[in-house]
Regions:
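Short acidic loop-to-helix transition motifs that present clustered carboxylates
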Residues: 32-33, 77-83, 230-235
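ATP/pyrophosphate-binding catalytic subdomain of soluble kinases
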Residues: 183-227
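Short helix-capping/linker segments at secondary-structure and domain boundaries
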Residues: 69-70, 166-174, 291-306
Length: 317
C-alpha cells in the first residue's frame, strides 16, 4: 500500500455514497403508489433480470420477496441464457434491473418477457430510458446522476425498493438512520489500516450483499475477492486465499461460527445497533462494505471514480 492516502472528499464516489440516505428516502416515497399496485398483482411467479450490481440487487430482491411474500422468485441467469421467451409466462411478474436502463442484454430480455405475456416492470435510475419505455411500469431510483463508475447509490436504491415491495416501505426505511450513522462514522475495517479481505461472506439476505461488496472491492480498490454465501464458503472456498474473511451478518449465524474455526473473521458492527430488521440491516452492511472498499483504494493511491477497463454502461451479450 502507498503511505499517502488520498482524501475521501476529493472523490466523486465518496460524495455519491454520502447521498444515499437522501436517495433512499426519496426513492421509497416516490415509488410507493406503484409498489402498492404491484403488491395487488398476485403473480404466479416473480422473475428478476440484472447484471453486475443490478444482478446482486436482483438476488437480494429474490431472497426477500420469496421469504416474505411466499411467491416463487428467482433471478434469470446471464440474464436469460438460452431460453428466450420460453423463460417467461402470462402469470409472471418480471422485474428488469438496469441502473442506466440501457444494458443491451437486460433490455432484450425484458422485451422478450413482454412478448411472452409477462407483466414487466423496470427498475432503473433513468425513467426515460429504453428499458422503462419497454416495460408496463417503472420503478425509479431517484438517485440523480451517478458519475463515478462503481454503482453505490443506485444499487442501494434498487435493493431498498425490492425490500419495500416485499415488506413495505416502513421496513425498508428503517435502514436510513443506521446508514447515515455508518457514513458519519466512516468505518476503516480493522485497527492498523484498511482491510484487504481474503473473501467476503454473507448470511441469508446478506449473501448477495457479500457478492456486491466483493464487486466494490474489485471495482473501487482493484482487489479481486470472492463474495459468497457463508454456507457455500464452507464447501470449498474457505480453502482459498490467506486474508481474513469479511463477514456481513446482522444476526448470529452458525456458518460464521464454523468459518471462525478455519479463518480469521472480521465482522463489522452495525451502527445504532442496526435497524431492528435483518433485511434492512443487509442494506446497512452494503454501505459499510462500500466504505471499506473505498478506504482500501485510497490507501493504495487508486482513483476510485474511474476504474480501468470499466464504463458506466456495460455492453454484454
Amino acid at each position: 500500500m502507498s503511505a499517502v492516502a488520498l482524501p475521501r472528499e476529493q472523490t466523486r464516489v465518496w460524495a455519491e455514497m454520502g447521498e444515499q440516505p437522501e436517495v433512499l428516502g426519496r426513492a421509497l416515497a416516490a415509488n410507493e403508489p406503484l409498489l402498492d399496485r404491484l403488491r395487488t398483482l398476485a403473480p404466479l411467479r416473480i422473475r428478476l433480470i440484472g447484471h453486475g450490481s443490478s444482478g446482486h440487487a436482483a438476488r437480494f430482491g429474490a431472497a426477500v420477496v420469496e421469504a416474505r411474500l411466499g411467491v416463487p422468485c428467482d433471478v434469470v441467469p446471464a440474464p436469460d441464457l438460452g431460453g428466450g421467451s420460453a423463460l417467461y409466462g402470462g402469470g409472471d411478474l418480471v422485474l428488469a434491473l438496469s441502473q442506466s436502463g440501457r444494458t443491451p442484454s437486460v433490455l432484450s430480455a425484458a422485451r422478450r418477457a413482454v412478448a411472452a405475456g409477462a407483466h414487466v416492470v423496470a427498475l432503473t435510475n433513468d425513467p426515460d430510458s429504453p428499458l422503462a419505455a419497454s416495460a408496463h411500469g417503472s420503478l425509479s431510483c431517484h438517485a440523480g446522476e451517478e458519475v463515478a463508475v462503481p454503482a453505490t447509490k443506485t444499487f442501494l436504491a434498487q435493493a431498498a425498493l425490492l425490500l419495500a415491495l416485499a415488506a413495505g416501505t416502513g421496513v425498508a426505511s428503517r435502514a436510513l438512520a443506521p446508514i447515515a450513522a455508518a457514513l458519519e462514522a466512516r468505518p476503516a475495517g480493522v485497527p492498523g489500516g484498511p482491510l484487504r479481505p481474503g473473501m467476503v461472506v454473507g448470511s441469508r439476505s446478506a449473501a448477495p450483499i457479500a457478492a456486491e461488496v466483493a464487486l466494490k472491492f474489485a471495482e473501487i480498490a482493484g482487489h479481486a475477492v470472492l463474495g459468497v454465501d457463508a454456507a457455500e464458503a464452507l464447501h470449498g472456498p474457505v480453502a482459498a486465499g490467506d486474508g481474513p474473511l469479511l463477514a456481513l451478518a446482522a444476526r448470529p449465524d452458525l456458518n460464521l461460527d464454523l468459518l471462525r474455526a478455519h479463518r480469521d473473521v472480521v465482522q463489522p458492527a452495525l451502527p445504532l445497533d442496526g435497524s431492528g430488521d435483518a433485511d434492512a440491516d443487509a442494506l446497512v452492511l452494503a454501505v459499510i462494505g462500500q466504505i471499506m472498499a473505498l478506504d482500501l483504494a485510497l490507501a493504495c493511491g487508486r482513483d476510485p471514480d474511474s476504474p480501468p477497463h470499466l464504463s458506466k454502461v456495460t455492453r454484454s451479450a
